[in-house]
Amino acid sequence: MRHNKILSAAIALCMVAFFTIGSVPSASASPPTPVPVTITAVYDFSTLPNVTGTFTTTGALTISGVSTMHVDLNPFNGIRAHCVVTLFPSTGGTIIIDQQCQFASSPPKGRWEIVSGTGAYANLNGNGSLTMPPFTEAMTGVIYLH
């Protein structure tokens, strides 16, 4: 009889624990907040495929500095390119941006995405669209704030 009382008490405690744990709200991270940004870079294209220039940003980031870009044209048709842009803010750190571009439209256009960074920009994420008027990379999109 005593064994049944202990077993009943143990089952009751397990049930209380189960329902108590089940009612605790789960902790979930809030999704990152997209904040608009514009990145404008101006280059000297006379040294293709590796060009150098300057950049400025507005919106979610307000920085400026030196920029480099490696242009890798599609060897089959020359209409598409993959570019890697590196921004060197005057305050330190780097931001690396991958671009996928096409030259069939006027002005040429494409997409960009921040793929890495260092210093204050180590965990920076962002993406958007771009147009390429002469000598310029005009990127608009969002930076995701965590």
Predicted ranges, named:
Residues 3, 25, 99-102:
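Residue-identity detector for glutamine
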Residues 17-26:
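C-terminal segment of classical bacterial N-terminal signal peptides
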